[in-house]
Amino acid sequence: MHFETVIGLEVHVELKTDSKMFSPSPAHFGAEPNSNTNVIDLAYPGVLPVVNKRAVDWAMRAAMALNMEIATESKFDRKNYFYPDNPKAYQISQFDQPIGENGYIDIEVDGETKRIGITRLHMEEDAGKSTHKGEYSLVDLNRQGTPLIEIVSEPDIRSPKEAYAYLEKLRSIIQYTGVSDVKMEEGSLRCDANISLRPYGQEKFGTKAELKNLNSFNYVRKGLEYEEKRQEEELLSGGEIGQETRRFDESTGKTILMRVKEGSDDYRYFPEPDIVPLYIDDAWKERVRQTIPELPDERKAKYVNELGLPAYDAHVLTLTKEMSDFFESTIEHGADVKLTSNWLMGGVNEYLNKNQVELLDTKLTPENLAGMIKLIEDGTMSSKIAKKVFPELAAKGGNAKQIMEDNGLVQISDEATLLKFVNEALDNNEQSVEDYKNGKGKAMGFLVGQIMKASKGQANPQLVNQLLKQELDKR
């Protein structure tokens, strides 16, 4: 790269309150189009908004978890624009007095910790949803008025990889606070990215482009990587970067010009006359602060310092509260800490990715996973057998030992039976026997593999190693 990359992210998070930001309508995902609306959402003349106090509490909780200063006085403003899914022709947002400012989160990239500043967190209402179908469009106002918080980072991010790490950490923190389920596929987390380039050593920022239609963390990274390359090529060829909004095209992996970017003046912000300012005293702040649960960094430190897990394991296990809670419940049922960590990061994650399901959508429970891990610990079940048992355990639930027995996968621990497999392997692989005698350690591993293959993975591996060494020493 001939230039330094400067990235800032704007993340919208939908709060999972029961009702909307300024109306009593339900704020649930997945209802029939236009069924979760009332006269306030539809902007009937004369109706007045009423602030949802729980949404304010949750915005404060999120801001505190992000190490932000909470405003003593915060007000709402009108952001004026016309669009079919915005019935009032303005959005109630916050302009110059947001509820939270001056925060930060720490991210890890390539083994190094970096602090990313957060400029502000403000509250606003969501717009409806437009669906374009050929020559006509459909509008669903269920989402209109849903409470949002917008979290704006400082331009401290220097690469697409750092942007990805920031989003992962931000999502994790918000999920732990319980104020949102932060599911991109359901629209409860959305991200716009601003990116510009400047010569190394220059303090002044370059002209930025805003990227939209970033529907996954991978698309955020890919969109930024493409835009980084596009801007560099443009600057090196003597061209100029325009301040514009661009859309990421998932099929081509490129960004496409949407429009010349608007500034904040185009929205003609002014104070919302129908909502009085919020006055937040210390007692209110303290009440909210007491509701903040254990956050990912605290759990991570606990897993390393108290449970003895490697930092990498602790990082992976705490990425989502769902996985972290499952891990803690499993070891509470008596499963070995490291074995549980290995299974959650390995076999469990592989199963979830392969079947495109969430952990809580499976039949797996901390109790039945702990049961399987204890069978591995005491030698009743080998790792190979566990890999065959696990998919059924996750899909149907039940008991790992019963699944093993029902499928004829019981581990062979009878010495006489195992000796037959051992001697057969030795007779069929005389060269490996010679290699072992000549000090080649790999020969032992090869012979164990042959025995496990012959027994269809059901031989007790510890006993196999013991008997194999015993028989080799006789030859």
Curated annotation (Swiss-Prot):
InterPro entries in UniProt: Asn/Gln-tRNA_amidoTrfase_suB/E, Asn/Gln-tRNA_Trfase_suB/E_cat, Asn/Gln_amidotransferase, Asn/Gln_tRNA_amidoTrase-B-like, GatB, GatB_C_1, GatB_Yqey_C_2, Gln-tRNA_amidoTrfase_suB_CS
Pfam family of the protein (one): GatB_N
Coiled-coil stretches noted in the UniProt entry, renumbered to this chain: none
Entry keywords, A to Z: ATP-binding, Ligase, Nucleotide-binding, Protein biosynthesis
UniProt-recorded Gene Ontology molecular function terms: asparaginyl-tRNA synthase (glutamine-hydrolyzing) activity; ATP binding; glutaminyl-tRNA synthase (glutamine-hydrolyzing) activity
Family: Belongs to the GatB/GatE family. GatB subfamily.
Quaternary structure annotation from Swiss-Prot or TrEMBL: Heterotrimer of A, B and C subunits.
Name assigned to this protein: Aspartyl/glutamyl-tRNA(Asn/Gln) amidotransferase subunit B
Lineage: Bacteria, Bacillati, Bacillota, Bacilli, Bacillales
Gene this chain is encoded by: gatB
